[in-house]
Structures are given as structure tokens and as C-alpha cells.
Amino acid sequence: MSAVTVNDDGLVLRLYIQPKASRDSIVGLHGDEVKVAITAPPVDGQANSHLVKFLGKQFRVAKSQVVIEKGELGRHKQIKIINPQQIPPEIAALIN
């Protein structure tokens, strides 16, 4: 499975998360996943909620349209973006 998959209702992203980074950013490929750096620490779900908020802004969707499908408690996550309004250039470059 590739890092970015296009479905009928949106995108599925396989992510590797780097918490407690100096700034929020989509770094690029990390193996067969997309590396995303976020500033929030991995404590009490702070990193997950921060990730959902960050991806919502990047894809211009509501937070409810960003769904963590797998990896709630780990660094490796599978995220579904429902009907993205915009696709960041870092992700667009990975879509086949």
C-alpha cells in the first residue's frame, strides 16, 4: 500500500508522526509513509487532536472530516480525509 491512496470519498494517508517538533509541517516520505512533524507532546491524546486540527487546516476541511482509522496510540497512523477542498503540494506530489 502506498503512502497516499485516493478513494471515491477522499484520501487515505499512511503517516509517521514526530511529536514535540519545533514546528508543524508535512516533512515528506519516511519509508512508505508520509512523515508529519507536530509540536504537541504525545500525552493524553494531545498529539492526535493537534494532528487532526493541523491536517484539517492543510486540506481545508472540518476536523470531523479527518478520521484516524488506525494507530490511535502509536506513531504509525492511517488517516482518512473526507472530501478535501485542497491538497497540500507535499501530498499532491505523492499521488500517482
Curated annotation (Swiss-Prot):
Signal peptide: none annotated. It comes from the Bacteria. InterPro entries: DUF167, YggU-like_sf. It holds the Pfam family DUF167. GO terms for cellular component: cytoplasm. Belongs to the UPF0235 family. HAMAP family: UPF0235 (MF_00634). This is UPF0235 protein YggU. It comes from Escherichia coli O1:K1 / APEC. The gene is yggU.
